[in-house]
Amino acid sequence: MTQSGRWKVVNFWAIWCKPCREEIPELRRLDEREDVSVLGVNFDGKQGNDLATDVASLGITFQNIEDPSQALGVPRPTVLPTTLIITPSGELVATLIGPQTIESLEAVIRQSGPPR
C-alpha cells in the first residue's frame, strides 16, 4: 500500500449500503487530487463481472482492490461504510465509520500532518 508518495483512502462499500452509495461522489472528487488515491473494497467480495456491474451502476471511477485488512493488521470492518486513511509511507492513521464527505476526509489528512 505504499505507492507513488500518495495518501491512500481505502473505502469499504457494498451496493446494498445506502450511505456507501451516497458518499461515492465525494470519494470520486477526492480521487481527483494529485496527492490522494482512493481505493475501493467491495465488502461482499465480488469479483469479475459481478464487481464490474456494481462499479458501473454506482459510477465508481476509482480503483477497487482486494480486502487489505490482513495486510494492514486491522480487523475487517463490520459496519459500512468504513474508510481507512493511510499515509504515503503506509501508516494507518485513521479508521472512519459512517459516510464521509470530501471535507471530512481532507480534514483527517490535514490533521495527520505532512507525509512521513
List the model feature ranges, each with a label.
Residues 1-2, 28, 111-116:
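Proteins that catalyze or organize thiol-disulfide redox chemistry
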Residues 1-9:
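A short beta-strand-turn-helix
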Residues 9-10, 38, 83:
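Hydrophobic beta-strand anchors of alpha/beta hydrolase catalytic cores
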Residues 12, 41, 86:
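Catalytic metal- and UDP-sugar-binding loop of GT-A-like glycosyltransferases, i.e.
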Residues 12-29:
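Conserved redox-active cysteine motifs that mediate thiol-disulfide chemistry
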Residues 14-18, 44-48, 70-71, 99-102:
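Solvent-exposed loop/turn segments at secondary-structure junctions
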Residues 22, 30-67, 80:
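Conserved segment of the thioredoxin-like fold in thiol-based oxidoreductases
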Residues 53-60, 66-116:
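Thiol/disulfide oxidoreductase modules built on the thioredoxin-like
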